[in-house]
Amino acid sequence: MAAAPTQIEAELYYLIARFLQSGPCNKSAQVLVQELEEHQLIPRRLDWEGKEHRRSFEDLVAANAHIPPDYLLKICERIGPLLDKEIPQSVPGVQTLLGVGRQSLLRDAKDCKSTLWNGSAFAALHRGRPPELPVNYVKPPNVVNITSARQLTGCSRFGHIFPSSAYQHIKMHKRILGHLSSVYCVAFDRSGRRIFTGSDDCLVKIWATDDGRLLATLRGHSAEISDMAVNYENTLIAAGSCDKVVRVWCLRTCAPVAVLQGHSASITSIQFCPSTKGTNRYLTSTGADGTICFWQWHVKTMKFRDRPVKFTERSRPGVQISCSSFSSGGMFITTGSTDHVIRIYYLGSEVPEKIAELESHTDKVVAVQFCNNGDSLRFVSGSRDGTARIWQYQQQEWKSIVLDMATKMTGNNLPSGEDKITKLKVTMVAWDRYDTTVITAVNNFLLKVWNSITGQLLHTLSGHDDEVFVLEAHPFDQRIILSAGHDGNIFIWDLDRGTKIRNYFNMIEGQGHGAVFDCKFSPDGNHFACTDSHGHLLLFGFGCSKYYEKIPDQMFFHTDYRPLIRDANNYVLDEQTQQAPHLMPPPFLVDVDGNPHPTKFQRLVPGRENCKDEQLIPQLGYVANGDGEVVEQVIGQQTNDQDESILDGIIRELQREQDLRLINEGDVPHLPVNRAYSVNGALRSPNMDISSSPNIRLRRHSSQIEGVRQMHNNAPRSQMATERDLMAWSRRVVVNELNNGVSRVQEECRTAKGDIEISLYTVEKKKKPSYTTQRNDYEPSCGRSLRRTQRKRQHTYQTRSNIEHNSQASCQNSGVQEDSDSSSEEDETVGTSDASVEDPVVEWQSESSSSDSSSEYSDWTADAGINLQPPKRQTRQTTRKICSSSDEENLKSLEERQKKPKQTRKKKGGLVSIAGEPNEEWFAPQWILDTIPRRSPFVPQMGDELIYFRQGHEAYVRAVRKSKIYSVNLQKQPWNKMDLREQEFVKIVGIKYEVGPPTLCCLKLAFLDPISGKMTGESFSIKYHDMPDVIDFLVLHQFYNEAKERNWQIGDRFRSIIDDAWWFGTVESQQPFQPEYPDSSFQCYSVHWDNNEREKMSPWDMEPIPEGTAFPDEVGAGVPVSQEELTALLYKPQEGEWGAHSRDEECERVIQGINHLLSLDFASPFAVPVDLSAYPLYCTVVAYPTDLNTIRRRLENRFYRRISALMWEVRYIEHNARTFNEPDSPIVKAAKIVTDVLLRFIGDQSCTDILDTYNKIKAEERNSTDAEEDTEIVDLDSDGPGTSSGRKVKCRGRRQSLKCNPDAWKKQCKELLSLIYEREDSEPFRQPADLLSYPGHQEQEGESSESVVPERQQDSSLSEDYQDVIDTPVDFSTVKETLEAGNYGSPLEFYKDVRQIFNNSKAYTSNKKSRIYSMMLRLSALFESHIKNIISEYKSAIQSQKRRRPRYRKRLRSSSSSLSSSGAPSPKGKQKQMKLQPKNDQNTSVSHARTSSPFSSPVSDAAEGLSLYLLDDEPDGPFSSSSFGGYSRSGNSHDPGKAKSFRNRVLPVKQDHSLDGPLTNGDGREPRTGIKRKLLSASEEDENMGGEDKEKKETKEKSHLSTSESGELGSSLSSESTCGSDSDSESTSRTDQDYVDGDHDYSKFIQTRPKRKLRKQHGNGKRNWKTRGTGGRGRWGRWGRWSRGGRGRGGRGRGSRGRGGGGTRGRGRGRGGRGASRGATRAKRARIADDEFDTMFSGRFSRLPRIKTRNQGRRTVLYNDDSDNDNFVSTEDPLNLGTSRSGRVRKMTEKARVSHLMGWNY
């Protein structure tokens, strides 16, 4: 008898028997039951006495009736998932009971421990190859082991020696703006040395991969570039365009090779065939006309046949071939079409032939891709039916494996919201390098990785936030694939692990993110290039970005957008020069605004590398435009002298004579005979009406002048090549051919692949066909097409060629733009000095990391040679404008960094000692006060060229932290903010000293090019002080070069100065101080001193021992240093550093000048250092004390290394006086005079009498006494020194008057509006919208909606009326008339209306990539950049006016018990919490009648996020002026007499209050209803009331307010009830610094605790505005729909501008009834209601943070941060989009809800 089983065993036997009984093994179950009873293996039962009894199997079943027969199976199914939670298996989702290792159900943590190999295991070989790592080998193997194994075996696995984690080191080298429109195409040449970009601006550009230089521009296309291809021989590039033409250029010379015209619609794809059969090759192109063309060309002669082999594949009208792909051997090409059919063509025979049509897909085929290797005939196709198919040719047919995008990973949950897409569509497909996996991109933003053999889903990759249209496999690493999409994200993925390695977000400052449209890897895999929607080229790669630092961020050739003329064969010539574009001489490099780059950048242009400086400055003369005005002269360097030299005139005259002679001789047949010349002799084109092709609009930044495009009007003789130039230029090589060996190997490889393909095809064709075909059908659906197909669909309104004629006038007028802020700022800066264009002042500000204005005094003298005019102090405004927003953040962070150490250090001790004298630790250290020049410690001077050693700086920081001298933020050190090498060549461009203890020296260091010595444009800041036992980490470049030339060897004897004595030693060895910096010279020598000590030394601290040197008497002792030796070791001035004279001559001249200056009484206070016993606090305020005597002693000792260092210290005399004393005190004025006199004397090297200079300055001051009243004093708290001329800024009088004039904003707004009108982007928004052009109206009229506004109709909301989407239509013509009528009360009202135009644009257009949306964004950026200055100056004027008010007004305000409208802050601790309860009376839904737009909803920046307008499909005509902008309504579209009422809506937002919070009724209390009604009715009589009477009236009204409501904040209804009240203007003058660039955040406030929500209250009053008439159309008619109580909807009538409001008359259709409008009453009421909105406006801003979204152009909540909604929203469902005009609630998508609740993640 067997042993009694345990309870578990008995139960297991029972479960097994039950399981067998329920299955097919019933006999086995019976046998098992018998054996269980026989061996008594059935568990026994117990009775109530505890006795055991045997029982049968049936009894056991009855006792366990709750156990089903499959209970054992369920237990086994549950074990695996439960175990996975504790110890995951190696292959997720695999359920097995028989696994081993990590798949075993008996696994534990010990069994799953990761394996580690020793070094010898890597050296093993398995079948001649290194073994694969085990699955549980977690981290990558050690590179040392792999390298050692490779040395032993001679081979290694690529995955071992280069782990996928290495791709984390890829970084963006440069982002270059090179196009004016979206760039959809990018490609590398076959060598990887060149990059090609094709853009919607019709240009193809060639770039250098290694350094990012722009090498050439290929012109000729007249529409968007849709695709590009480079042939395999690397000799040709072909580009297809929406102009139906394929152009082919020679890569070597950029000469056009062929213009292929065989399509009748846009080109959709273009490819060179890889086939190598014979000398005839093929170029294929597919088009939107449903055709594919095979263009034959000869590989040797590069001649193309005119007629292609063409296949027209149009199964029905409208079919397009959207994509194509060649097999790797070139024998097959497959195409995908919009008719759901895949077609395959065979090129193995004499002519191409179609061999198959595959119709398995049920929707458009958007992507096809052949596999990369020729060992199988496979390709993948992706369709909008939600599937991809892997096709393979087998047994005479193409069989497919279906990849269903709805498939999910087992045990993997999708991210929330990703599976909400109702219909999945494939957007892109790709293979990995070795064809083991297929990657598909889906419209739910996921990437899916599939096994290419079985079709199994391997990984789901999530991370993108928008659709992905770019999938690019690594050229040789099968693990790596790159993806990019419209969300601006670029990801590098590891396909083996299904993980993200690296990602980059393409955020463009001030413009949101840029959608990435194309990416390509270089052939060697070291780089990849991307292009985006904003015209940028992004270069990524491994290694250092040093070479990319030499190029500017914006690179255009000035000839890029010149007009072209075309011959009958569509070849082009430059219109101005009559030359082929590739034969024109080297162009000039300009930025996006058309401004030439400095000469150092001009040498980047091929052909200009060796030009002299004067040859690099473009001299483009005056050219008359279409209006008879002159184009602004574009030169490389603006000077005050505009008179051209006589030589220039002579040269131009000779050029003109030569042109005429050549014409007469007939040598230049294409030279235009009718060329005219202007007065100055510059070339004038007689045919200026021909617009540029392409006609491009600039979209860049705020100062959008037509810069690059205006350059085409300037074509002087200097840009017309001579015969010799043409010969030299034709010999240039832009793109090299492949090396013969490389080319031969590649061709052999392609030949072999082609042979294999033919062989496979032949074999499979002979096999017996199979009759079982795998095929799945899916429901058809319509959705988004592939990128290129989509672009073709948008072409009707995106292309600029369709509107070319319409934009000619604005093109001609663009040349006279002079309103650019950047230009004016540059003039103000450069005008102060005739320095070179490498202006360190601008560079300091463009990368500001110091808050001190002393940084603005840089070494211009060193760059300018003999030019000694000192740089003037710039105004604060100039500095702020030059800096970007990110720079300002760095500025603030550095200010905090500088303040914190000060506070920390000051805690060490008191300011003054017990004896009353200053504490010694506050004294300036000796190394700063020293007047004798020394090599060490290093004392910085302006203009010093240094070698910065990172190791030494790190050692200094460690010493400071160890000694706790002051707090140091490691994160803000330069090596943590940028990539620094071990040693950098830098230049001091800014110096500032911080008060101690200890006194710190802050330096601004600009990078210098090691070769040219010019500044690269980047810089960083450091702060340090001299510390004992800490070696200098800044070494003068001169000393460094001398030390490097000595080349110390082991055993060499040297000497070194330590404590003013020579010490001797021997070089023992040379090795890097730290292994991680192997190339650094810092302390790289190990030396043995004669006193037997050993130490690390730097070569510049070691001096050779000259012959005849006296050695010490005792070995190891020192020898005193003589004065001659010290002098010989000092810095030797370079040529030009002291002007035209030598240092000795200049020093003696200035010493004599100082001596004479000290004879004057006003200079005596500055003769000697300040007496610290008399002024003990002086050293706690002034960090760098100096005086005339100190300067004189330093001059005597030749302390200064250059004249700019001397001038910098002279400025500190005035700076210190200004810092310590009152600004207007006599001592400061005296210091100003001393500084001015001395600086002018130093600057004029011919002057020897300083008293004469003093008399001249005094005379100038007397003459300019009146003018000084109009100058503005710059910030007196700045820490930097400056001259008096630095305080007085030229042309400040006008700006000061503007700041003091509260009405100056009106003129400024008119100028801004004129500027907007000059932009072509404003054209769609100038006039009201024509409802005939919008779908909702067409449906009502029964018209066809197919031909109008195609974009909106692709939307699901086709039935939505324009009026349902746009509650508040407005256009620029309305704004302009309102502004001219004087109906705006403040610039904020003007701002609201213009913002409403942009909000409407966002709300209506559904396609964020549409051209109209881009136009709106550019126009909005332009507007925001100008309006913030207008509002800022308006605020200043209002506050200035308040300061001049009588005192009794202040008493009135001060008597208020709560926060007054004056904005004066309450005492801390006494500020009261106030609640805002705006009451909605009859006029609440009316905004201001001043805008003639009584709309109800508040102006909001956060509308629904979609653009407003679309262009009509008018290819040859201009814009329809009625198709954009506002809104007009047909009076016949509705039944007359049916007046429609609308509800008022108030935003349910919480209100925050601040010290400078929203406006109140004078005393901070909310008016009662009676008071409010009184204010409304009394607004009219205020119009004729004088200012004094109004003040009295206001006081009287205030006295009636109830004191019981003092705790509440009024609704600001009295803000404009009287003209004498300043509350309205105060509402717009919160804080000037709250303006930010980007999303227009103009109303930030100090946030406090929010109170309660606003309550929606409806008024019952009737409106007074009515229109009259019955017919016609006009602008005001569109406002009629907001009228209540009218007697009809239709009709001709006079609008609110007609009467009473002082405005113009408007005639149009409206819904309002008959009757005259009461303009004045409405205007006043509207102002009051608008002020109520102002309170809400500011309240929302105080509540909301600044929110950025990546869903630009989508209808989502919180697109901008100006408001939440513009409709009343139910509190039960706050996440919706408000209600439409018809009352329908606009629901938010689930994704938008998640985004709103969770916030946007970057």
From Swiss-Prot:
Changing residue 1596 to E: In XLID93; uncertain significance. It comes from the Eukaryota. Found in most adult tissues. Down-regulated in a majority of the B-CLL cases examined. The modification Phosphoserine is found at residues 693, 703, 885-886, 1577, 1579, 1763. WD repeats lie at residues 170-209, 213-251, 255-297, 307-347, 353-393, 400-452, 456-495, 502-542. Keywords: Bromodomain, Chromosomal rearrangement, Disease variant, Intellectual disability, Phosphoprotein, Repeat, WD repeat. The keyword Transmembrane helix does not apply. Residues 889-898, 1587-1600, 1627-1643 have a biased composition (Basic and acidic residues). Residues 796-817, 1479-1499 have a biased composition (Polar residues). Residues 846-859, 1454-1468, 1520-1533, 1601-1626 have a biased composition (Low complexity). Residues 818-829, 1266-1278 have a biased composition (Acidic residues). Residues 1138-1245, 1300-1430 form the Bromo domain. Residues 785-795, 899-909, 1441-1453, 1649-1666, 1684-1697 have a biased composition (Basic residues). One of its GO terms (cellular component) is nucleus. It is linked to A chromosomal aberration involving BRWD3 can be found in patients with B-cell chronic lymphocytic leukemia (B-CLL). Translocation t(X;11)(q21;q23) with ARHGAP20 does not result in fusion transcripts but disrupts both genes. Plays a role in the regulation of cell morphology and cytoskeletal organization. Required in the control of cell shape. This is Bromodomain and WD repeat-containing protein 3. It comes from Homo sapiens (Human).
